[in-house]
Amino acid sequence: MSEAMDQPAGGPGNPRPGEGDDGSMEPGTCQELLHRLRELEAENSALAQANENQRETYERCLDEVANHVVQALLNQKDLREECIKLKKRVFDLERQNQMLSALFQQKLQLTTGSLPQIPLTPLQPPSEPPASPSLSSTEGPAAPLPLGHCAGQREVCWEQQLRPGGPGPPAAPPPALDALSPFLRKKAQILEVLRALEETDPLLLCSPATPWRPPGQGPGSPEPINGELCGPPQPEPSPWAPCLLLGPGNLGGLLHWERLLGGLGGEEDTGRPWGPSRGPPQAQGTSSGPNCAPGSSSSSSSDEAGDPNEAPSPDTLLGALARRQLNLGQLLEDTESYLQAFLAGAAGPLNGDHPGPGQSSSPDQAPPQLSKSKGLPKSAWGGGTPEAHRPGFGATSEGQGPLPFLSMFMGAGDAPLGSRPGHPHSSSQVKSKLQIGPPSPGEAQGPLLPSPARGLKFLKLPPTSEKSPSPGGPQLSPQLPRNSRIPCRNSGSDGSPSPLLARRGLGGGELSPEGAQGLPTSPSPCYTTPDSTQLRPPQSALSTTLSPGPVVSPCYENILDLSRSTFRGPSPEPPPSPLQVPTYPQLTLEVPQAPEVLRSPGVPPSPCLPESYPYGSPQEKSLDKAGSESPHPGRRTPGNSSKKPSQGSGRRPGDPGSTPLRDRLAALGKLKTGPEGALGSEKNGVPARPGTEKTRGPGKSGESAGDMVPSIHRPLEQLEAKGGIRGAVALGTNSLKQQEPGLMGDPGARVYSSHSMGARVDLEPVSPRSCLTKVELAKSRLAGALCPQVPRTPAKVPTSAPSLGKPNKSPHSSPTKLPSKSPTKVVPRPGAPLVTKESPKPDKGKGPPWADCGSTTAQSTPLVPGPTDPSQGPEGLAPHSAIEEKVMKGIEENVLRLQGQERAPGAEVKHRNTSSIASWFGLKKSKLPALNRRTEATKNKEGAGGGSPLRREVKMEARKLEAESLNISKLMAKAEDLRRALEEEKAYLSSRARPRPGGPAPGPNTGLGQVQGQLAGMYQGADTFMQQLLNRVDGKELPSKSWREPKPEYGDFQPVSSDPKSPWPACGPRNGLVGPLQGCGKPPGKPSSEPGRREEMPSEDSLAEPVPTSHFTACGSLTRTLDSGIGTFPPPDHGSSGTPSKNLPKTKPPRLDPPPGVPPARPPPLTKVPRRAHTLEREVPGIEELLVSGRHPSMPAFPALLPAAPGHRGHETCPDDPCEDPGPTPPVQLAKNWTFPNTRAAGSSSDPLMCPPRQLEGLPRTPMALPVDRKRSQEPSRPSPTPQGPPFGGSRTPSTSDMAEEGRVASGGPPGLETSESLSDSLYDSLSSCGSQG
């Protein structure tokens, strides 16, 4: 308008001057100009108005978008919290169910004499149904009726499935489930699983599996099976398999099948029809068995032995039970021999059996089974596949007697079931399983079902082939057991069979037969990622026994468990275990542990248990491995793969996922080690592992789902391992198996030791897993996925939260440790939340979690290299399957995230949600907590390993982007500045305070006062610390170099660290653990990480750096808490080990280097240098002081670290008792550094708990002195530094003390209390600190 005005003015002016010339024109021109002016003004005003309107609209849109985003984030957060609550509830329920089942099973075992009778009754009824075996539907209905006794719902399902003709209905029901919304379907599956568990408990109590097996194993059974193998009887075996599955997993399995299949029943029905005479009875038996253990037992007996066998079944059952329990070890050995023999001669059959003519039944079965797997169980069941398998099992049974029977029961029945339920139900069951962690795999399974079915068939068919090829029971018998054995190992191989295998693994002898079947099938499905996922989810589902499809698998697991239980005693427990595990992996783990203990009572089964473990563990691993590997790996694994499966198992804990996974993995590791060591079923245990490992690597995507499944299995197995070989087996199984069967004994000790610590046990196993598990390394990379096993463990925290999550975390900080914890103590539920918290972090970035996993794997690998803690290493490895770890990591991270939120729902959550960095002040992120969280999750993904710190930074950056888009950028910048200022201030204060603790031991540092004497020297470096803080704040100077230097060591140490993380979660997280590592690596790294990660890293640095890396990862939350104490947001990934490199871009380079070793955790500290600065300073003085202290002369130099590492590593690697020497090297450095810083930090908050332990130097290894504990525990080499060890511990604890300042006190206490609790507390504290900082 001004222009227009000017123009008019100018116009008139011009005309005016020229008025004289153009007087006449002036009026017209002026009017014209005025008119134009008005027009321009009107136009301008209109444009201005339009502009304003547009601006308002735009702003409104922005506001709406921002609101929507925030709302969505908040809703997501709420949903997460709700999911966590539900998971917890499920976990509690599952644990209750499992405990009840275990008790019931124990009672049943006590009344074993009556057991055969019970099965007898069912046997006869199944017998009658067999009378009308021709009528598949008739038989189906009959079966449903028995089922109906115990489970009306099942009856309905069975009837539906059976009546439809099996194939159609089964397929239809899964679609129906599919049709349901995933949420509803999950709910339905969960309800089904819960009901199944309820029903299963009684069935399990009946522990018909044992009787069934004996009858099946009875001489009659093999013949009928063989005879049937050739003809209609073959179908019988198939139905028998369901029965068998139901027998051991009995109700759980049946329910799962039925449930999963609303049409699994169809499958099962088909199965029954398969063996018209025997199949129906078996189906019925299954029906009955699940519902009525006796029915199941008799059914299996009847099916397997046929009517003729039916009569002897009872006697055979009782005899077999007694024999099995007494001779389970021998049977397993025999099975092993068979497997070996068949491996040599039947390897081909296994791989090519299904195709081979010998497999005529098998091929027949294969197509049918494929069909079945695809969703037409009837054709599959009807086909000879199940029968073939059964015959094979029957042969096994014949050859080996009760064990073969078990094998047949487990293998034949289970394998087919696993195959068809796994696949047909896979979708449903997998979904169920997925409910817990890998829904997507489950879903994929539905589509992949055909493939997986085929894979399963292949896996199973080969076993079937083997079985059918040797219609003359003997060959089949050996082959079946062998298959079973391999499958056990391969259990992990195939998702669907895998669950079966897992169950079989639990079942021991059964494991092997099924393993044979499952193996071929497992590997095939696992090979294909989809298949792998599918199969794995089935396994998960099986474990869950929620999903219809996987139900079979769970059934298998249950059966295996039952079988194991039968062998071991609490067969009922296993089924719940699978159920619980699937429902809540952690729960399963936890429950399984208790059940395992219960099972443990059944020592006769104990031999079976150990072998079962190997099977279960291998199975778990096989799941992972087989998926990757193929039938071959599974088959191969029997002998050679045995170690690999172990690794797979070790890796497993890393699996997502699920924390329970971790827990399970830990359990698996334990189981494996236990079984292997106890039974010397190294082959069995080991074979599966190779498969698992392979599977893990190849089927990462499957692994994610599969990991969870294995985890689930593992928990079951772990339970058993824990029960029977609770100490050695539980912990050592996985890792030991992986590293060396010999370690089993050590793991046993370790397990017990850990068990004493509670979470520690698992932690250690997890740690070993971490170390050994490549997956773990991978998980490290996958940061969120599994590396934050500890964090992710939290996802499964309920069950294996502490153990699973943390062990996972080992590399990732949380997952490894948690798994360890959970297995160690079912208690870790408090810890579980911790795990959950941690889990969520890793979970945040599931993709990254995978990356984290990778990172963890890398770290793990170093850990493996540093088998200082062989047990730990192997175990860590076993639990952390690459995929499993990833999956577990993701899940656990998610859970962790959710739990973290739950834990510090108020400010903590908010702070955490609000950008980890900027909003930990509670400043900028309060608006978008969900967004922040999501960013964090993204960050986690980005820095899977470094996760937290990196995640924070990434998150911050992402959030900043979002904020900018949402006009929050300014707020974010302010928050960042504030955060930095706070960090610096806190760093200063912390450094001063920590030094103070050294001297005066002020307030928070009062605890440090305990370590004052030791800290005094360290605190001499207080100035140095301050300087370092300043340096870090200013520029994160030297850390990069030093960091890297230590990192290589850490790389060496990292694996250990990873493990240690798990072991030291309490300590490491407490700032103390990381301290040592940090001391050496952190000072250099801190500066670099200082800016971005400073706040995150400081704590991670100080907390997670040293051993803590693994340890820290295990207790990433603690680390964060510690950091947060310093002013670091809890989220810096404790999974630093894995994620640290990713944690902070700045520190990333250094961190990346560090990830190889504990340093990964350390890198986060670098990132958080500002916050950590004080810690770093502490650390630096600590390093100098440590050197001065003489903790280890080498401590000062990073290279020295290596020399010092031996001793320090031992300290640092406390978790890795065996690996003390290797692990300690990096830890030494860490320890040195940490001694100083941690002493301060720990002194304050952790000191009370840690200090004494530290001073104890003892390996109290109690959860109490997490860092110290670890170190003390590590203790042999620790002893000399013990004095310093305590300071060391103190050092680490000091880090904690930082956290303590912010509420880490609880954490500090928890370290002593429980690894899991420590983790939880530290996580919580870290969140709180975040809030307080804000």
From Swiss-Prot:
- Function, in words: Regulates microtubule organization and stabilization. Promotes microtubule growth and bundling formation and stabilizes microtubules by increasing intense acetylation of microtubules. Both tubulin-binding and homodimer formation are required for NCKAP5L-mediated microtubule bundle formation.
Coiled-coil region(s) = 28-106, 956-994
Q: Name one GO cellular component term.
A: microtubule plus-end
Region Mediates interaction with CDK5RAP2 and is required for homodimerization and microtubule bundle formation, residue ranges: 1-139
Which protein, by its recorded name, is this? Answer: Nck-associated protein 5-like
Per UniProt, the short sequence motif (S/T)X(I/L)P motif 2 occupies residue numbers 816-819
Q: Which locations, inside or outside the cell, does it occupy?
A: Cytoplasm, Cytoskeleton, Microtubule organizing center, Centrosome
* Ranges of Low complexity composition bias in the record: 468-481, 810-825, 1079-1090, 1197-1206, 1313-1334
- Region of interest (Disordered), ranges: 1-28, 115-146, 210-234, 266-316, 349-711, 782-884, 931-953, 986-1015, 1030-1183, 1197-1334
Which organism's genome codes for this protein?
Homo sapiens
GO process terms (BP):
microtubule bundle formation; microtubule depolymerization
A UniProt-annotated Pfam family: NCKAP5
- Annotated region Mediates interaction with beta-tubulin and is required for microtubule bundle formation: the residues are 750-1146
- Residues bearing PTM Phosphoserine: S440, S451, S470, S477, S493, S496, S498, S571, S577, S767, S1194
Q: Where is this motif: (S/T)X(I/L)P motif 1?
A: 484-487
Skewed-composition ranges (Polar residues):
358-372, 519-547, 638-649, 1110-1122, 1235-1247
Q: Does the keyword Phosphoprotein apply?
A: yes
